[in-house]
Amino acid sequence: MKEFVIVTDTTTDLPREYVEKHHLYMMSLPYTLEGTSYTWENPMPVKEFYDKMRAGSLPTTSQANPEEAATLYESILKENDVDILHIAFSSGLSGSFNSCRIAAADVCEKYPDRRIVVVDSLAATLGQGLLVYKAVQLKEAGKNLDEIAAWLEENKYHLVHNFCLLYTSDAADDMQCV
């Protein structure tokens, strides 16, 4: 059984300590607020982020492009004799999943003895993080890449996401949950 590593996106909201402890690789999906770009490596403090949003600033996000994904995959494969399982941000919310599939196909042409399996989590934030968490548990229990990918494909449909949408009305300056 060939060793493999788990890659996911910074959209999982997993704690940095967890990522480091379990040797996860992160695909950075940057965001921009008030003209400044932020990444996993260079984040804006959470309180500052929400304070700016309360004041009316809106962040924009950027998907991973195939070149960025290929660079990450190649850096992993050059350093390690492993396969890759990438649990990607929802294809319904970003083009990153498709960029990663394109990159995986290109990189596998250069490394024909390696596999890169990209799973569309159909999830975001901690929903995606829960899938990563379970993949880590399964890997630590001795499951192989194919078994974990199959589990993810079957179980990603059982996640429920709840969101609280905040808005300001003309009649009130305070935020309200709808």
Tell me what each language-model feature is.
Residues K2, H22, P112-R115:
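A short helix-to-beta-strand connector/capping loop
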Residues F4, D81-D83, R115:
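The start of beta-strands in P-loop NTPase/AAA+ ATPase cores
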Residues E68-F97, A104:
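N-terminal glycine-rich phosphate/adenylate-binding segment common to multiple enzyme folds
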Residues C177:
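Cationic, low-complexity basic patches in intrinsically disordered or flexible, solvent-exposed regions
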